[in-house]
Amino acid sequence: MKALYTLIPAIALATLSADALAQSQEMIPPELATRFVGKDGMVCGKVEKAKYAQSSEGEPTFLYMGGMFPRHTFSARIDGANRGKFSFAPETLEGKDVCVIGKIQRDASRAEIEVSSPSSLKLATIK
């Protein structure tokens, strides 16, 4: 019976949805995201600038946070192959508060999360 009690929390954790996991994560400001490189995290802030780089290789969309491009501290990168998964143009998030969920990577001197699905982006209320 004791083994059953230790198994229940593991099952509960395994069934957590991405939304529940995101809500339980601490919000990381874009300015501090480089401290979390290599870890999964939720970076939240205002999208200062959004750009669909159609003429660049892979046709990525960038959501720049933590300052205006090119002085931003964080970017969310959506590969062109993943744009079709969105029911809206991701660049319409410019000016909105957003949380980006995923593995934080380094891009030059900045932090970046590669967004592969709409579930990795959440509108946020940041105070």
Segments predicted by a language model, with ranges:
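Bacterial N-terminal signal peptides that target proteins for export
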Residues: 1-8
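Bacterial N-terminal signal peptides
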Residues: 8-15
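N-terminal signal peptide c-region/cleavage motif recognized by signal peptidases
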Residues: 17-19
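OB-fold single-stranded nucleic acid-binding module
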Residues: 23-127
